[in-house]
A protein has these predicted regions:
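C-terminal catalytic "cap/lid" subdomain
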Residues: 1-62, 68-97, 101-348
């Protein structure tokens, strides 16, 4: 079947699902490969995998996950070799060809890099080669990191024009309360896309392994949803995976949004960390709703100092109404000067 006639599914597998008692789960990898093989005639598959830092840390006898950038980079560099070799061995046993792809956040702002990455991934899929993707931690900086593979997988979903993003985690899906702390927590099977409803679910949990808790999974669903892509959050089992591929109800299914937003603005909204918060008046809010830039004279209060290029939360009446990138620093504030340009501003 031609690549254009196949649906593309992006599968993100988290560290807590992939690592079993300090080792890569052979059961999961074999089941993943076997079921991809069975569905390869009708679907293209892209894998976004975690696990490199954990595997590298164990190889280097780190007792806990490193916190410094240098140690994270070393652990990732060591672990990435083991990770991709295990994928290659298991997938080759099922006559599947994989390709390692390491990417950085630069591709969001660099049009040429974005186009090149898109072309490379599409060509791999056209040749029935399965891209196995991870962030290039070794060359990334704090400022130029996705920070977690949940949001990376959402960006990849956009690049390959996926029909669905499947997030494999150690929980059955999204819950109305943190199931680790509340025995009455109930799993939510189905969510109509609504950013405010999803935002209400963000403070749920954070896992001990890896960098992505449930908040980043919700952000990934928001990024994907605003690009017309469904997200399904499941715990790993062979049946759950097959059901998700075949469109059956399992875990939590988050539908796509009717509204589409450009990738750069999606990253500003859900991927970029804010360093400051500013309060604005009604006039400024009405102006940005009409597609105008945010001017300094609409700012009522600055909560923290900021520099050019910093992320800023924009607040009206104690509600986060927008987010953007500072065009000037806080000590340059002056009437009628643009604080956040409309191209770097998104209303939430």
């Amino acid at each position: 079947m031609n690549i254009k006639n196949k649906k593309t599914i992006v599968i993100k597998i988290g560290t807590t699902s992939l690592i079993d008692e300090g080792r890569l789960s052979q059961t999961l990898l074999r089941s993943l490969a076997e079921n991809i093989k069975q569905h390869q005639n009708t679907h293209n598959f892209v894998i976004v995998t975690s696990g490199a830092v954990s595997l590298g840390g164990m190889e280097l006898n780190y007792k806990t996950r490193p916190k410094s950038m240098k140690k994270l980079q070393v652990a990732s560099a060591v672990g990435q070799i083991q990770l991709i070799n295990e994928y290659k061995k298991v997938f080759n046993e099922n006559d599947l060809q994989i390709a390692q792809v390491l990417i950085t956040k630069n591709l969001i702002d660099d049009r040429e890099q974005f186009v090149n990455t898109t072309q490379a991934l599409n060509e791999l899929l056209a040749q029935n080669i399965i891209p196995v993707i991870n962030e290039n931690d070794v060359v990334a900086t704090e400022e130029l990191k996705f920070g977690d593979n949940d949001r990376l997988s959402a960006i990849v979903s956009i690049i390959v024009n996926a029909s669905k993003l499947i997030l494999v985690t150690n929980k059955q899906g999204l819950y109305n309360f943190n199931p680790d702390k509340n025995s009455d927590a109930k799993m939510i099977e189905f969510i109509q896309f609504n950013s405010s409803q999803l935002n209400d679910l963000i403070p749920i949990s954070s896992d001990g392994e890896g960098e992505g808790g449930f908040s980043t999974k919700i952000m990934a669903a928001q990024i994907a949803g605003f690009s017309g892509i469904q997200t399904q959050i499941i715990s790993w089992s062979e049946q759950n995976f097959v059901d998700a591929i075949e469109g059956k109800q399992v875990g939590t299914l988050i539908l796509e949004s009717d509204k589409k937003i450009r990738l750069r603005k999606l990253w500003i909204a859900y991927g970029m960390q804010s360093t400051s918060k500013i309060e604005i008046d009604d006039g400024a809010f009405n102006a940005i709703k009409k597609n105008a830039s945010l001017l300094c004279n609409g700012v009522v209060k600055i909560h923290e100092d900021f520099n050019i290029g910093d992320g800023i939360d924009v607040v009206l009446n104690d509600i986060n109404v927008a987010k953007g990138i500072a065009k000037i620093s806080s000590n340059e504030i002056s009437d009628n000067i643009v604080l956040i340009h409309i191209d770097d501003l998104i209303i939430l």
